[in-house]
Swiss-Prot record:
Keyword Isomerase attributed: no
PANTHER family: POTASSIUM-TRANSPORTING ATPASE A CHAIN, POTASSIUM-TRANSPORTING ATPASE POTASSIUM-BINDING SUBUNIT
Oligomer status and interactors: The system is composed of three essential subunits: KdpA, KdpB and KdpC.
Keywords linked to the UniProt accession: Cell inner membrane, Cell membrane, Ion transport, Membrane, Potassium, Potassium transport, Transmembrane, Transmembrane helix, Transport
Domain of life where this protein originates: Bacteria
Record's subcellular location: Cell inner membrane
Transmembrane segments: 5-25, 64-84, 136-156, 179-199, 254-274, 285-305, 330-350, 357-376, 421-441, 486-506, 529-549
Topology of this chain in the membrane: Multi-pass membrane protein
Provenance organism: Mesorhizobium japonicum (strain LMG 29417 / CECT 9101 / MAFF 303099) (Mesorhizobium loti (strain MAFF 303099))
Protein name stated in the entry: Potassium-transporting ATPase potassium-binding subunit
One term under GO cellular component: plasma membrane
């Protein structure tokens, strides 16, 4: 590790800290329905969309109606995206002549982008046409991100309201998020990326002749606009197979910094939105502090492991850290930082190959996802994920002091705890069961490139990434097979919707409750004691569930590497 590396990490953290409050202030006004500087521009369009859809901003929904609207909208998006893939060969804006996508891969991709996972069992430049990238994948990047933020806002309303029957309107929340938050920021980011050299064109691929006289096809396309939303919306799916390691997606250190900041920006701002909506900004800062502590710990371990490198390479007299699978324009520090950011959020974009990280370096992204990506998390998804842990933490605190658990004046009772635990436990259910089957199924084992514990880690990482709606991968697993396409697709759907429904149920239950005034015995939830308790619950409840699997995978691999054994 170097001083320069830590300075870059601290600069990133400082920028996120500076952006959290102003972004939170703006987003709070958007979802409150207050006037914003963009209201004269998007206001008429917003009202027109409501008239077309037959809804009104004054019409609110019970949590069940909110959930039904959300599920129907996502089902429609899934079917449209699947159809676009199957009909690709007959559709325009296909200069490379791409054919129809295989049915199993089309199912996997549709599930991937609808759930904000963006797991890719294909190379974008060799499989998807310009039309599919724009009208299919990029559109889902917007609406899946807006869906996640809408759920977070609905859950916050559950804590903020008292004796209410509704938690907002899904159509209104999603429309406002898209028009006032995602779209304006993405327009600005797209222009910045084009200025930095990222392509944005509908022209055909370019054929070039190299210095050796060989022919090479250079893939182009509407890249900048997709990169903007894939990072801001924590989608992560790359236009190119190499994702953010490709120079056309992430050309230099400036674009890399912007992309890292945009991955965390909205997720961090939601903590401030929470504080404003419940009337106590200290509550939001306490949540952000717990996220920040876990994040810094993850960055420190990952950076240390990658900077220390491989002892087997050190024995050869080479001591430069682990640069395998990393871009020289980013180096070890920014590669490790990006890896932790992209897995702390449910982004999944990569600027280095996680499969080439050391055993401990690769374990940190894995743990981030297994914790439910509650360290800032995806736009909306991470925040409603950490609120599930907050419900459990408050319940534990209540048990310790012998009082009925309360949070923000709302009594946390059996229903809320059961729903929170259901949301928390559905992730290991999807991650571990599919992994267990895959490592004993011959057709699934055949896709594993490496033996021993690293091969197991590749499979575990795949299903962990799917259920956590992350989308990053250990590249040694060949996932484009019927087994992996279907089971990973199912895992993505489970990880998304089996968390959403309990979260909305908690929102509806809390919104209907009366607010209880704080008393001398009320456990304070805006101080360092609560931050420590929340971190402890996340690590114990979320982390220990996966310890046996981690012991079989990266931990054994690390111990074997120390003793000179590789896989």
């Amino acid at each position: 590790m170097t001083l320069n590396g830590w300075i870059q990490i601290l600069v990133f953290c400082g920028i996120i800290g500076l952006l959290t409050k102003p972004l939170g202030f703006y987003m709070h006004r958007v979802f409150n329905g207050d006037r914003t500087p963009l209201s004269p521009i998007f206001g008429p369009l917003e009202r027109g969309l409501y008239r077309i859809c037959g809804t009104s901003e004054r019409e609110e929904q019970h949590w069940t109606a909110y959930a039904v609207a959300l599920l129907l909208f996502n089902l429609a998006g899934f079917l449209v995206l699947y159809a676009l893939q199957r009909l690709q060969g007959s559709l325009p804006y296909n200069p490379a002549g791409m054919g129809a996508v295989d049915p199993a891969l089309a199912f996997n991709t549709a599930a991937s982008f609808v759930t904000n996972t963006n797991w890719q069992n294909y190379g974008g430049e060799s499989t998807m046409s310009y039309l599919l990238q724009m009208a299919g994948l990029t559109v889902q990047n917007f609406v899946s991100a807006a869906t996640g933020i809408a759920i977070a806002i609905a859950l916050i309303r559950g804590f903020a309201r008292a004796s209410g029957k509704s938690i907002g309107n899904f159509w209104v929340d999603m429309t406002r998020c898209t028009l006032y938050v995602l779209l304006p920021l993405c327009i600005v980011l797209t222009l910045v990326y084009v200025w930095l050299g990222i392509p944005q064109t509908l022209g055909p691929y370019v054929d070039a002749t190299t210095l050796e006289g060989a022919k090479q096809t250079i893939a182009l396309g509407p890249v900048a606009s997709q990169v903007a939303i894939k990072m801001l919306g924590t989608n992560g799916g790359g236009f190119f197979n190499a994702n953010a390691a490709h120079p056309f997606e992430n050309p230099d250190a400036i674009s890399n910094l912007i992309q890292m900041v945009t991955i965390f920006a909205l997720g961090a701002a939601l903590t401030n939105v929470f504080g404003r909506m419940v009337g106590n900004q200290r509550q939001g800062w306490a949540i952000l502090a717990s996220m920040g502590a876990l994040f810094i710990a993850g960055v420190a371990v990952c950076y240390w492991a990658e900077a220390a490198g491989n002892p087997l390479v050190h024995a050869l007299g080479l001591d430069g850290g682990n640069m395998e699978g990393k871009e020289t324009r980013f180096g070890i520090a920014l590669s490790a930082l990006f890896a932790v950011i992209t897995t702390a959020a449910s982004c999944g974009a990569v600027n280095a190959m996680h499969d080439s990280f050391t055993a401990l370096g690769g374990m940190i992204p894995l743990i981030n996802m297994q914790l439910g990506e509650v360290i800032v998390g995806g736009v909306g998804a991470g925040f409603y994920g950490i609120l599930m842990f907050i419900v459990v933490a408050v319940f534990v605190a209540g048990l310790m002091v012998g009082r009925t658990p309360e949070y923000l004046g709302k009594k946390i009772e059996a229903k809320e705890v059961k729903m929170a635990m259901l949301a928390i436990l559905c992730l290991p259910l999807a991650m571990l069961i599919f992994t267990a089957i895959a490592v004993v199924l011959p057709s699934a084992v055949a896709s594993i490139a490496n033996g021993g514990p690293h091969g197991f880690s590749e499979v575990l990482y795949a299903y962990t990434s799917a259920a956590a709606n992350n989308g990053s991968a250990f590249g040694g697993l060949s996932g484009n097979t019927p087994w992996y396409n279907i089971t990973i697709g199912i895992g993505m759907l489970m990880g998304r919707f089996l968390v959403i429904i309990p979260a909305l149920a908690i929102a509806g239950s809390l919104a209907a409750k009366k607010t209880v005034p704080a008393s001398a015995g009320t456990f304070p939830t805006d101080g360092p004691l609560f931050v420590g308790l929340l971190i402890g619950v996340i690590v114990i409840v979320g982390g220990l569930t996966f310890f046996p699997a981690l012991a079989v995978g990266p931990i054994i691999e690390h111990l074997a590497m120390i003793h000179g054994q590789t896989f």
